[in-house]
Amino acid sequence: AGYKIYNFDGTDVKWRFAGCDTGENCQMKVYWDAESFPGEAVANVWDYDPQWKVEYFEDGVKVCDMKRFEGKDPYASEVYRDPSSLKRGWVCAVLTQNLFRAPMSGDAKSREVRVTDRFGNVFSEAFESTGVLVVGGGASGVAAGIQAARCGAKSLIIEECPWLGGMLTAAGVSAIDGNYNMRSGIFGEFCDRLATHYGGYEALKSGWVSNILFEPHVGNEIFHKMASEEKNLGLRHGYAFEGAEKTADGWTVHFEKYGSEGGDKLTVRTKVLIDATELGDVAAACGVKYRVGMDSRGETGEDIAPEKANDIVQDMTYVAILKDYGPDADMTIERPEGYDADIFVNSCRGPRSTVANYGRILWSPQEMIDYGRLPGGKKYMLNWPIDGNDYYANVIEMSPEERSFAYEKAKDITRCFLYYIQTELGFKNLGIADDEFPTPDGFPFIPYHREARRIEGEVTFTVDHAAKPFDSDEPLYRTGIAVGDYPVDHHHYRNPDWANLPELHFYPIPSFNVPMGSLIPKAVDDLIVAEKSISVTNIMNGSTRLQPVVMQIGQAAGVLAALAVEKGEKVRDVPVRDVQDVLLASGVYIMPYLDLKPGDENFEAIQRIGATGLIRGVGRNVDWSNQTWFAPDDPSIILRAAQIDRTEDPFHKVKIDLHGREVEE
């Protein structure tokens, strides 16, 4: 059902059909290898007339004009198959003369139906099939796609915005938090390429928030270069996720070109689907159960969790990259609507600052600016956590339109903070960088989300698992696929009711590893969840959400997906040790031991022995630098572990499940 839209320009009249519940430019429904039309592409072009062209393409080359025929729409036939289930039993699928068909070759990488109406408007729907589909090209997604491709799986990343890297680049958080002494895998490669670009690792220590800072556009360029080097990896930008259906052997996933109003659609059939979106939107659409907000103590067993659960998430930040335009420049922006200097007075030391700053240190204005100083000395990341530009909004269950509205509010806070910096602190020479983000307002493409949906996975990683990995009845450390050393860090001060939030006292934790089962949702097959939506408690998310961990999670997701495709197994049935073997061969830590770095002849040995628990390391907390050592006091233990690994191979002899428990063959 639908209606006609007529556009009048004097005596010139143009029109088009608009279906109910579809975008204005949606002019057809395409069926790829449908049950009723096997081996064919079939399009129902709703408002076809003889002046229209209906063409079929494969791999970007026109194959033929599609042949018109009379038949029944497959979707309508399915909907009206059982009259007894309908409110009006006399309704049925009828014949239409607006069907078009073309045979599909078996070896095409991509297919497209392209329709051109009498006025020259072009509408298209494309189809691809792949082994591994990664939705989201953020920090986790780009690593997942690259690794799956390296493992030999035909892989595809689909990212809505024009950049790769997510929070590291598209959100402007170009300061890496943690893992400086555990750089490995694709994360380590990215860091090495940054160092090469800027002239060494010392050049990356430009600000004091991190040992590795960089300009976001440089990070995006590096990620695109890394992706382009993988022959098994495809990449599509500008497509928004629309939905997914489970099939017998995987998923059929639907996308729409951003801003096309239904005129440019894409369907992808995949064996394994990876959700690497910023908020876990794909997992939710696929029916995965999930949690949002703070967990209760009774749910997680964490004694530092609040007594009652709630839906409060961490503050987000709409970062800005500032640029120094020179000492004589006046980049002062127009006073933002609703500007209130009082909310920023304790962001740094100043004539109006007070001692009521939640017990935090007040830095000088220049120190605050230098916090996010980027290499080159002319740009600064504005992502200040102390009465700065954090913003509270729980957008997880919002519609795209509602999210966009919330993001503009978050930008407003950053604009207000910038105005405060320019007018109250005297940095008139600083303004939004005009050569960083190709966006109308110069802001990043997306905000920085610190928290997302958290799935109910095969296992749930808690802060207790991290704090005392060897004391748990559930030895998840044996199943590690990523490591982190960042403290439990939560942002809540911009919540309007922050003073009444549950009081959380985060105790120090050693460095930790992330269990493989936290990536695998319960009861939903052929799906892996990465980024910040893994199965982790709200508290532990404060450590697992950081960029190095998220990139390693993505790399592990890529290995897991590729092995599932190669073996023809369900994701949950892929052995933990098989995934760990590939990661170790790729120079990735599975245990957070600092004794040896990847490339050392005994690195893999202590990683494997550590993951069996035969020799257990020692965790330490040193300020913000959390550590774990395999043999802190006796280096000879490393040689003994290497000998055990070589002669007895306990890592492979004992099979374990996703909980780290031994399983009898």
Please give the residue ranges for each predicted region.
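Catalytic cores of secreted or luminal carbohydrate-active enzymes
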Residues: 2-29, 575-592, 598-616
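Binuclear metal-dependent phosphoesterase catalytic core
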Residues: 2-61, 92-125
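Aromatic sugar-binding surface patches on proteins
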Residues: 73-103
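Beta1/beta-strand and adjacent pyrophosphate-binding region of the FAD-binding site
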Residues: 128-138
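Conserved N-terminal/central alpha/beta ligand/cofactor-binding core
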Residues: 147, 153-154, 159-243, 247, ...
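Conserved beta-strand-loop-beta-strand element in the redox core of flavoprotein oxidoreductases
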Residues: 245-267
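Flavin (FAD/FMN)-binding glycine-rich loop and adjacent Rossmann-like elements that form
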Residues: 259-272, 276-583
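Extracytoplasmic Gram-positive cell-surface binding/anchoring modules and repeats
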Residues: 592-606, 610-665
